């Protein structure tokens, strides 16, 4: 179920992989997204009731009554979840100060990021693909946390497509590198590519965020322990990252 699970003070988080759920076929087994290819028909989508069970399995593993996931649109909007919101906000980053509320970000080859400032009691998740990288969604999330009082933000960057696999047209590589030079890469076969994870990490470091690269050396396209849009096509599931803020005083 978990590729990596960790904690920092009262903050607990994990990055998931494919195993441990109930979905079948391309979605086997811990698929966390019901509508991965909207409008393409049932064969491209997992059974929503099974996805709900998968999310319940994750909620149980973290002992949280609710998990909030976003309707991710490759944008840069940041939503603050105040606890009243249990429906999926349309955004690619969300922040909360609510204890025992799971924040979930989902990705196949995009970069999932967990943010936390345990002292300020603020946590967040970010979904950053190529478009989110260019639009600066990670930077926007960090700045929103600071605006709400965060001073020492830690980021964990999860498994994603690596820069040796994520081939893109030359013009696209140029356009992204014009905004985030660190994201420029070359595939193992010598063609233009992007390393979105490296770009995201550069953006975090530019904001003086302390970064732990959980996904270093891992590639969702190459490793079948993960879902991959590039490897599996439109009918692919989504892994995710979850973060939970525990009540103050619960533990050190
Ligand atoms: Zn790779």
Where do the protein language model's features map onto the residues?
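Active-site microenvironment for binding and transforming phosphate-containing groups
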Residues: 1-252
């Amino acid at each position: 179920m978990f590729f990596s699970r960790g904690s920092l003070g009262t903050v607990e988080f994990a990055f998931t992989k494919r195993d441990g759920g109930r979905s079948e076929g391309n979605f086997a087994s811990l698929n966390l997204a019901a509508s991965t290819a909207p409008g393409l028909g049932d064969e491209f989508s997992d059974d929503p009731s099974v996805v709900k069970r998968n999310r319940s399995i994750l909620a149980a593993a973290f002992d949280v009554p609710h998990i909030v996931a976003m309707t991710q649109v490759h944008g840069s909007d940041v939503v603050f979840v105040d606890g009243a919101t249990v429906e999926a906000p349309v955004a690619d980053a969300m922040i909360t100060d609510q204890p025992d509320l799971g924040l979930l970000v989902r990705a196949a080859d995009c970069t999932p990021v967990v943010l936390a400032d345990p002292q300020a009691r603020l946590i967040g998740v970010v979904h950053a693909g190529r478009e989110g990288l260019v639009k600066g969604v990670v930077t926007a999330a960090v700045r929103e946390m600071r605006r709400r009082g965060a001073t020492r933000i830690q980021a964990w960057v999860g498994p994603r497509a690596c820069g040796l696999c994520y081939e893109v047209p030359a013009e696209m590589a140029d356009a992204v590198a014009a905004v985030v030079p660190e994201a420029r890469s070359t595939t193992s076969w010598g063609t233009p590519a992007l390393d979105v994870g490296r770009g995201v990490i550069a953006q975090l470091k530019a904001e003086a965020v302390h970064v732990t690269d959980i996904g270093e050396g891992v590639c969702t396209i190459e490793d079948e322990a993960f879902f991959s849009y590039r490897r599996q096509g439109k009918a692919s599931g989504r892994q995710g990252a979850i973060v939970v803020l525990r009540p103050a005083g619960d533990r050190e």
